[in-house]
From Swiss-Prot:
Record's subcellular location: Membrane
Source lineage: Viruses, Varidnaviria, Bamfordvirae, Nucleocytoviricota, Megaviricetes
Keyword NAD: no
Entry's family note: Belongs to the IIV-6 357R family.
TM annotation in the entry: 14-34, 48-68
Membrane topology: Multi-pass membrane protein
Main localization category: membrane
Protein known as: Transmembrane protein 066L
Keyword entries, A-Z: Membrane, Transmembrane, Transmembrane helix
Annotated InterPro entries: DUF5772
Key word Transmembrane helix present: yes
Superkingdom of origin organism: Viruses
GO CC aspect terms: membrane
């Protein structure tokens, strides 16, 4: 496309280049008007390439895809084992769920250690447990955080005295149902006898 002026014929790309250079002299670079004019010039040049030379436009699209793919792989590689990944991981515990198991990973900033706990989905007990103390008050919210996912106190056998109670009554309902009273120094083994 050409434009006829008093001095002769100008092509559209020359007009856009003139407009771009002229706006750079008048408007501050980085301003809103400058950004709009530069965007229009780039869009028009892309349009010219795609319309008049489609094979060049296709090659530019492939080049853009390759550049984006390399940038993504570089970013993943930079973040996978670097200090940036450790900063992101330290903010909160991460729970990874695979098909057959779950893994909980968290960083302890006090001891400067990573803790990883892996457990299978089928191992988690779904039984309902209710704990009552010697005064028949419900103390389940106090004892429940100590139980662990298998509801066995992480393999330990604490006594009611270890937990600060004189006696505990346990009511269990689910796959295994029973009711039992544990005295002060009797180990809390949560399986039926």
């Amino acid at each position: 496309m050409t434009v006829t002026t008093a001095s002769g014929q100008w092509t559209f790309p020359v007009l856009f280049a003139t407009l771009l250079v002229g706006s750079a002299l008048v408007f501050p670079v980085g301003g809103l008007v400058w950004s709009a004019i530069a965007s229009l010039a780039i869009a028009y040049l892309y349009y010219l390439v795609v319309e008049q030379h489609p094979h060049v436009g296709f090659a530019l699209q492939l080049l853009a895809l390759v550049v984006v793919a390399r940038a993504k792989s570089w970013w993943r590689q930079a973040c996978s084992g670097s200090w940036l990944a450790s900063i992101v991981r330290r903010r909160k515990p991460t729970l990874t769920v695979d098909e057959y198991r779950s893994t909980l990973t968290y960083w302890d900033p006090v001891n400067k250690k990573w803790y990883i706990y892996t457990f299978a989905h089928g191992q988690r007990s779904t039984d309902l447990l209710i704990f009552r103390d010697e005064n028949k008050r419900d103390v389940t919210p106090l004892v429940e955080p100590l139980l662990g996912p298998l509801q066995n106190f992480h393999g330990a056998s604490p006594t009611p005295a270890d937990l600060g109670f004189a006696r505990l009554h346990v009511f269990r309902d689910g796959e295994t149902s029973y009711q039992r009273q544990f005295d002060r120094h009797e180990p809390l083994v949560l399986t039926p006898h």
